[in-house]
């Protein structure tokens, strides 16, 4: 893609070919067109710069390091917050043994073991809160899941879609016509699309993983910006690594 930008547009800012900035701009222009791609690049670049100033310096990692993967409620103790218990256990028994902890989705969710996210910016109240996440990040490098293929039907974005309200009314993939889906293979037996009664009539939406998980439409640049905001929010809350789910 390094040769893509000059053929399409002269960038607003000059970037060295081969730089991350240049490559990101090239991708955005290819996906969203010249004008929209440049606007998105400026917005995303500023969000990244604003967040970078709050982060710890990067460290070099190698294959000798280990990361613990667990759910937020894997460890429990009486009425204590499970995330607090996890942090105390890890500090007492795993300090020097592991460098990081991957906590599987700890957000409010309606199904699929946390992968049908209802609210991306909240911690499940039965697990703890963002204070517990930040405390863990002071001692271990945290990995957080960003579920970007789909969200829960209980997410407020989908309520917007059903009621034809901004911003969510344009956030989801609708099925146009009757495409041939016979060649689609996936480890699920639920329908690829689901009929939804909306204020605009009955619509079919893509539901790749289940009828409770509606596919998000990244052809809408506002969806990209929304998830960039969420990603940088996770970084500010202490996430060191982001796992992109269902890519």
Residue ranges and their predicted role:
Residues 6-228, 232, 236:
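Acidic/aromatic-lined carbohydrate-recognition and catalytic surfaces
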Residues 101, 242-244:
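Hydrophobic residues within beta-strands of alpha/beta enzymes
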């Amino acid at each position: 893609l390094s040769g893509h930008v000059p053929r399409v547009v002269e960038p607003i800012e000059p970037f060295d070919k081969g730089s991350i900035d240049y490559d990101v701009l090239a991708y955005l222009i290819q996906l969203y067109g010249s004008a929209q791609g440049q606007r998105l690049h400026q917005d995303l670049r500023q969000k990244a710069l604003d967040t970078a100033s709050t982060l710890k310096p990067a460290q070099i990692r190698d294959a000798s390091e280990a990361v613990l993967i667990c759910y937020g409620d894997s460890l429990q103790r009486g009425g204590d917050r499970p995330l607090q218990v996890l942090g105390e256990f890890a500090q007492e028994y795993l300090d020097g043994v592991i460098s990081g902890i991957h906590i599987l989705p700890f957000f409010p969710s309606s199904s699929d073991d946390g992968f049908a996210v209802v609210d991306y910016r909240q911690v499940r109240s039965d697990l703890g809160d963002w204070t517990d996440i930040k405390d863990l990040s002071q001692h271990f490098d945290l990995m957080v899941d960003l579920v970007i293929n789909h969200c829960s039907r209980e997410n407020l974005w989908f309520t917007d879609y059903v009621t034809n309200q901004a911003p969510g009314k344009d956030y989801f993939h609708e099925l146009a016509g009757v495409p041939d889906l016979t060649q689609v293979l996936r480890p699920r037996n639920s329908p690829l699309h689901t009929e939804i009664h909306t204020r605009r009539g009955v619509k079919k939406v893509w539901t790749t993983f289940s009828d409770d998980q509606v596919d998000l439409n990244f052809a809408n640049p506002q969806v990209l910006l929304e998830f960039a905001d969420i990603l940088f929010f996770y970084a500010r809350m202490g996430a060191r690594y982001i796992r992109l789910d269902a890519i």
